[in-house]
Amino acid sequence: MLNTIVACLALNIYFEARDQPIDGQVAVTQVVINRVNDPRFSDNHCEVIKEGPVRNGLPIIGRCQFSWYCDGLKDVPKDQDAYRWAIMIATRVLDEGYEDFVDGSTHYHADHVSPAWSTEKTRVVKIGDHIFYRWEKKESKMIYREKNSEVMNRK
């Protein structure tokens, strides 16, 4: 049985980034974790992923933070190898920690779209076909270790 956090992160990796390079898949995971650590978002990984307006108990199509969650399709991975890979990435990121190479990014989008919010954020990096952004400039990198439930700033 999968840990709930790992399960949510793995689905997000699978549906948002399974066609991305490994560092792109980790970066998508980092965005969720950066949101969890940001007071503007929920401190719950699954709630961050599922954030968006609902109607009659269901997410409104096209209005979620992560598009796969409210696209109207079943959220069941078809490619089991890619899903197992996503589980492994989610587990490693949570268990082993990482240097935040998206530098605090809380947003990203595919490079073939230009959402209005992107002009109001600081562009950080492009990985694969995703462009990552953060709210504002910051000086420190963050290391996150789920196992110890701690966030350490490192300059």
Where do the PLM segments sit?
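Bacterial extracytoplasmic/cell-wall-associated proteins, especially those involved in peptidoglycan
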Residues: 4-155
